[in-house]
């Protein structure tokens, strides 16, 4: 067959396949045009999942009469100047949207320019103009109707999913666009039924309150983030670790006001929540980035759902720092049963832990599970696995209010639990509060009793707080181990036989050389030996027996993917969590009131104390009004 030049109509249909692959793609192109036109209100109507009808109306600046036909010419746009791809600030810029839609459907557009006296109308079918410009009826902005989608490309029509599935795609897309463009009012109507209507808002959090997927519950169980570094600003709202979901899909990412999908950003979110939520649960995150246009490429794919960052490491670090700062500053995460929580957690077999890590446990470590919890000495009795036993606590915040007159004393047996619960211990706590002995009530209140030798019951104002003693102490031990690691470094073990490893290329050698000091700080000594060979002489002692070659391979993979040595950090964090689980107070341990209160005070000053190392909540709060509802009291 001889080579022939395809007709413009065929070329447009082929190109349309990349831009318009489903009804949601049509909605995306038209709504993005409305946003770029400065619309304050955008209304979308859909019928039959978008196959029969998609109409988008806005009150934007409109299109001048003499430019309406030009708008349907391929790569004709008012949003980009030749050679200015490095400074894209609009949602659209390729000039393909209207051309692609008109190539595969019947399109009618009515528009009234802000400076014009009247509106004008034009129609296209299958890429061909079917009616010249005629006067139209419209008070302002632009109205576009798309009918019989893919009538000109029957093959594409056969591959559409069910009406319900296509409709859900449209709902999800519009919600993402409405989420980040919170200053614009949005509405979606299917035939005669209004699916949602969002008012223009002044802030992102107010828009999230309107949305069914988030609402007031998320806003109460979320943290605001706002962090800048160089040319990158990270902002948004992230759910508390205890507010998690069983299915993924609630991490929404945006770059310069554009909904995007990025494995880099998803990886940073996953790393930030590592150890704070269970492995089978997923966080709820609304993450937005403002990046200077010169440092991000949005011209990756016609769908504009992917972007490339010039400096991946900087972006990854900015997101990780923003989320990490917010999550760590929220020392004791508030939690109530209204939040979606995880169910169950990983149980660690005792014999397995002892077999794997036993040689790193000192006598003090093994005795930690029965240690006395006193405010002055709690941290010093937590097992030390790295370096010497001295830790500088000059910056610590030991709470000394539970001494002398401020201590709730127990009976002579030193235990308050369900088998011997007495009204005297409860009334004692109340009398202390009534007498005004405490200048300020601590956030987690004061212990009242121990329940089932597993839970601590405390009262703080109108709240009853139930604390899982093992989960809470597990987090305290883990954070203490991290503190020791940061102050004294990680204890290393010298390999009897240094392991020589041949790298794949010079780039890998450069990366290991660049990260050599950081890896040293993490207990891994790697030295170049010439050519493409490195030698591993020392590894973190807590790793035990380790495959050095596999370890180096994983480290290189982590550095190349995320620009950080997070694989080593993650492995250390996992082991520290396992050790903390083994070393913490077990369920069934009877505790004195002063021990319970000591645990509460340390929870208030310890990062991430709202969750154990497996992501389970360490406590729940029940408000008096919630308890009243259980008894149908008004």
From Swiss-Prot:
Belongs to the DNA mismatch repair MutL/HexB family. PROSITE patterns: DNA_MISMATCH_REPAIR_1. HAMAP family: DNA_mis_repair. Residues 406-427 are annotated as: Disordered. It comes from Anaplasma phagocytophilum (strain HZ). Keywords: DNA damage, DNA repair. The keyword rRNA processing does not apply. GO terms for molecular function: ATP binding; ATP hydrolysis activity; ATP-dependent DNA damage sensor activity; mismatched DNA binding. InterPro entries: DNA_mismatch_repair_CS, DNA_mismatch_repair_MutL, DNA_mismatch_S5_2-like, HATPase_C_sf, MutL/Mlh/PMS, MutL/Mlh/Pms-like, MutL_C, MutL_C_dimsub. One of its GO terms (cellular component) is mismatch repair complex. It holds the Pfam family MutL_C. This protein is involved in the repair of mismatches in DNA. It is required for dam-dependent methyl-directed DNA mismatch repair. May act as a 'molecular matchmaker', a protein that promotes the formation of a stable complex between two or more DNA-binding proteins in an ATP-dependent manner without itself being part of a final effector complex. It comes from the Bacteria. This is DNA mismatch repair protein MutL. NCBIfam families: mutl. One of its GO terms (biological process) is mismatch repair.
């Amino acid at each position: 067959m001889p080579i022939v030049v395809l007709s413009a109509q065929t070329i447009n249909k082929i190109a349309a396949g990349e831009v318009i692959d489903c009804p949601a793609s049509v909605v995306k192109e038209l709504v993005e045009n409305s946003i770029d036109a400065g619309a304050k209100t955008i209304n979308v109507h859909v019928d039959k999942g978008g196959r029969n009808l998609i109409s988008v109306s806005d009150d934007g600046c409109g299109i001048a009469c003499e430019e309406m036909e030009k708008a349907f010419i391929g790569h004709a746009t008012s949003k980009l100047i030749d050679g200015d791809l490095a400074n894209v600030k609009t949602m659209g810029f390729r000039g393909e949207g209207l051309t692609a839609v008109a190539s595969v459907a019947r399109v009618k557009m009515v528009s009234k320019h802000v400076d014009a006296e009247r509106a004008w109308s034009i129609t296209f079918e299958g890429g061909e103009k079917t009616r010249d410009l005629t006067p139209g009826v419209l008070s302002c902005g632009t109205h576009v109707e798309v009918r019989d989608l893919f009538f000109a490309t029957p093959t594409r029509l056969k591959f559409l999913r069910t009406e319900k599935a296509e409709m859900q795609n449209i709902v999800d897309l519009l919600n993402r666009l409405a989420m980040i463009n919170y200053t614009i009012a949005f509405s979606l109507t299917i035939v005669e039924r209004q699916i949602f209507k969002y008012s223009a808002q002044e802030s992102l959090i107010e828009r999230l309150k309107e949305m069914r997927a988030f609402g007031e519950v998320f806003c109460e169980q979320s943290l605001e983030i706002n962090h800048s570094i160089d040319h990158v600003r990270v902002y948004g709202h992230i759910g508390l670790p205890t507010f998690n979901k069983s299915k993924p899909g609630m991490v929404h990412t945006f770059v310069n006001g554009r909904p995007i999908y990025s494995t880099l950003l998803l990886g940073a979110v996953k790393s930030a929540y590592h150890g704070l939520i269970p492995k089978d649960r997923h966080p709820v995150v609304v993450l937005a980035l403002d990046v200077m246009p010169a440092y991000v490429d949005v011209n990756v794919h016609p769908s504009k759902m992917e972007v490339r960052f010039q400096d991946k490491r900087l972006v990854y670090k900015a997101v990780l720092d923003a989320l990490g700062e917010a999550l760590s500053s929220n020392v004791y995460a508030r939690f109530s049963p209204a939040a979606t929580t995880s169910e169950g957690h990983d149980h660690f077999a005792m014999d397995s832990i002892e077999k794997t890590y036993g040689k790193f446990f000192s006598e003090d470590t093994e005795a930690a599970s029965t240690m006395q919890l006193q405010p002055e000495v709690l941290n010093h009795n937590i097992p030390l696995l790295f370096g010497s036993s001295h830790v500088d606590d000059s910056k610590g915040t030991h709470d000394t209010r539970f001494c002398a007159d401020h201590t709730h004393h127990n009976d002579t047996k030193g235990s308050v639990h369900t088998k011997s619960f007495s009204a005297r211990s409860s009334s004692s706590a109340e009398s202390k509060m009534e007498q005004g002995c405490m200048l300020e009530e601590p956030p987690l209140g004061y212990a009242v009793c121990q329940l089932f030798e597993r839970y601590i019951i405390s009262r703080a104002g109108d709240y009853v707080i139930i604390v899982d003693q093992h989960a809470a102490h597990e987090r305290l031990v883990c954070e203490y181990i991290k503190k020791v690691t940061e102050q004294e470094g990680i204890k290393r073990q010298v390999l009897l036989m240094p392991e020589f490893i041949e790298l794949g290329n010079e780039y890998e050698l450069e990366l290991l050389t660049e990260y050599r000091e950081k890896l040293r700080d993490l207990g891994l000594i790697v030295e170049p030996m010439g050519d493409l060979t490195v030698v591993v002489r020392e590894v973190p002692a807590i790793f035990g027996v380790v495959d050095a070659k596999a370890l180096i391979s994983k480290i290189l993979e982590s550095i190349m993917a995320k620009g950080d040595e997070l694989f080593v950090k993650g492995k250390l964090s996992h082991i520290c969590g396992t050790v903390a689980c083994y070393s913490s107070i077990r369920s069934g341990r009877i505790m004195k009131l002063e021990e319970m209160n000591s645990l509460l005070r340390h929870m208030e000053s310890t990062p991430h104390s709202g969750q154990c190392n497996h992501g389970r909540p360490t406590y729940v709060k029940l408000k008096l009004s919630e308890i009243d509802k259980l008894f149908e009291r008004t």
